[in-house]
């Protein structure tokens, strides 16, 4: 009996070590290419990192294991990000949105709201879309509104609509979405080149509410798996 346990225990330990985090939270952009600059002059990377850290904190309090990707600001390769996420059950990339340059500075209220993005080429495309719906539902429940301008060929880029009501669009060729080995979504938290939207999202209470809503949506995604 002793020898049987001696053989079993190392195998059990190996199984524990092999288990990875539940969620990979990817921080969009990096220090050398920080993404859009907000209306108040803050880089998108800094906004993405702050929100991802807050979401990770909420998930951690609920016992969800999170792997933050790109926190050091040095992750230039998109495919390296999805490779680093291997072993996780869900990939979510955190971003903040912009508009086409000709519409800046933003004075039009249509350029506001969150959006979610999926790749229909992802190996778990149906689960990715279902997850995006979960996050959108939690955001809407918390009082955030989806944006729709990305579908417009003039005001946006004519992107394919996956779910209009929830602000979900397709970017099939985006590397962080179509090379992920798990369901994958990209979250645009809001249009930060819009001064009113940026100020609203950076309000501490609103910021906490958004982080909690995103975390709740991601928990719903995990529950469905």
Per-region residue spans from a language model:
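Cleavable N-terminal signal peptides
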Residues: 5, 16-17
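Active-site-proximal helix/loop segments of hydrolytic enzymes
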Residues: 20-22, 47-225
